[in-house]
């Protein structure tokens, strides 16, 4: 997932598109929640560490990417701008560096972003939880 694959319809509805690299996993007509995918696809700056390291991964890679996109939207800054691929691999993928969260941002929002970026995908929240927490933050005017 990356910003280039997010857009709006003429009616203003948000859409995610370009599913050329996605994988639908089904077993007996049901989606499988636990599966293994491998490969090094996508845009590095939004890529979860396990994808960049060519390890098995799950849907939690999209939670990581979404967290980076949320940070980019809130900061109006391209994440990891100016890093070479080698620097990115050393600092971000292997070193665990993440985008800086400004002190003035709501702490709940910062905590959510950090959870989305956790190096361990098992620690990352589900998309359902991310949506729920963002909804709570918006309704309580923590995010505006």
Residue ranges and their predicted role:
Residues 104-117:
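Conserved C-terminal C-lobe helix
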Residues 34-50:
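Conserved activation segment of eukaryotic-like protein kinases, specifically the C-terminal portion
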Residues 75-79:
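Structural helix C-cap motif within protein kinase domains
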Residues 54-59:
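Activation segment
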Residues 118-129:
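A conserved short helix/loop substructure at the end of the activation segment
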């Amino acid at each position: 997932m990356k910003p280039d694959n997010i857009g709006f319809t003429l009616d203003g509805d948000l859409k995610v598109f370009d599913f050329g690299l996605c994988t639908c996993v089904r077993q007996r007509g049901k989606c499988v929640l636990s599966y293994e995918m491998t490969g090094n696809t996508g845009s590095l700056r939004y890529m979860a560490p396990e994808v960049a390291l060519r390890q098995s991964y799950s849907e939690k890679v999209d939670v990581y990417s979404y967290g980076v996109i949320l940070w980019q939207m809130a900061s109006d800054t391209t994440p990891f701008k100016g890093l070479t691929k080698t620097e990115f691999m050393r600092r971000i993928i292997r070193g665990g560096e993440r985008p800086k969260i400004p002190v003035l941002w709501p702490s709940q929002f910062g905590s959510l972003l950090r959870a989305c970026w956790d190096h361990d995908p098992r620690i990352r929240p589900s998309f359902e939880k991310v949506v729920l927490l963002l909804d709570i933050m918006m309704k309580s005017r923590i995010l505006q």
